[in-house]
């Protein structure tokens, strides 16, 4: 793939996604942190806590890519840690055997959990713990997508990424952001499950497009674009266009779910309103952050509203 060229249109201004953009909210988020977008109506203390919570899903776990035993150990210790900090059942594990970066990715949750526990019910904490464990249990499976020389289908890959992308733990912090309590039963409806699923798909598909070059450079190719290339025998730019089509379809499904929620009359209106708004902001927060930062490409590579780069 090295040397091939790919083009990404301006998703922040794409006709399917454009209705989600709130320009004034983005102006308040000039420092490019997801938390400033999804917490735009929250107290500053909530924003700070949410920002620190992101350390769990933003840090680069590739540091353990070449040490499977260590990755499995980190996974086990992480599970014990979150049971201790959110479930208050287990003893805290000793993390000193891990690199400082990985220690801090967990230990910042001491403060995060204190704030969330003081503000929300035990049922709400159980929802958050469940989604964090769902993500953490996938930590030692990263970069095994092509194991045994098997190329997954796009459907298999997207299903796998629902777990490894770390979107669900972010969604599970929405009750904390909005100051509401929820139970797992209230979140088990078919529409709510579809909302989470399509939010996750949009986030990790968009991220895969933006991060392709960085992942190849880092030797971590857990990415939709190569999956599309290998399944369909197409070049990188064609696969990128197909990925854009998948994003459009997922965005349309998201809009359909929103309309269904708006036409339904239930006693969970406050909860559904909160999840709809923040899920939209999570998606566009990622897009905004990707365009304004230089983690994946330089501003000079944005030409006529498109990103043109060599892999």
Which stretches of residues belong to each language-model region?
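Alpha-helical, largely C-terminal catalytic domains
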Residues: 1-311
